[in-house]
């Protein structure tokens, strides 16, 4: 009865500034949890969110699973 893959999937966007400078300046890597519709956004999602380790709004990209 199932049609295959689910259309809505859970993704984890990650701060690219913390990921790039890991170990040097910041204490950790900021990650959020959200959902996306695979049919409407087939490419990787980029969101501008607040990173508590950087202390500013940065771009968060969807990670590989």
From Swiss-Prot:
GO terms for biological process: translation. Pfam families: Ribosomal_L33. The keyword Cell membrane does not apply. The keyword Chaperone does not apply. Its main location: plastid. It is found in: Plastid. InterPro entries: Ribosomal_bL33 (IPR001705), Ribosomal_bL33_CS (IPR018264), Ribosomal_bL33_sf (IPR038584), Ribosomal_zn-bd (IPR011332). GO terms for cellular component: plastid; ribonucleoprotein complex; ribosome. Keywords: Plastid, Ribonucleoprotein, Ribosomal protein. One of its GO terms (molecular function) is structural constituent of ribosome. Belongs to the bacterial ribosomal protein bL33 family. This is Large ribosomal subunit protein bL33c. The gene is rpl33.
């Amino acid at each position: 009865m199932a049609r295959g893959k689910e259309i809505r999937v859970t993704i984890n966007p990650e701060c690219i500034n913390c990921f790039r400078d890991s170990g040097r300046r910041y204490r950790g890597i900021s990650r959020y949890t959200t959902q996306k519709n695979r049919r409407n956004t087939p490419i990787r999602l980029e969101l501008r969110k607040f990173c508590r380790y950087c202390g500013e709004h940065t771009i968060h990209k969807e990670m590989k699973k």
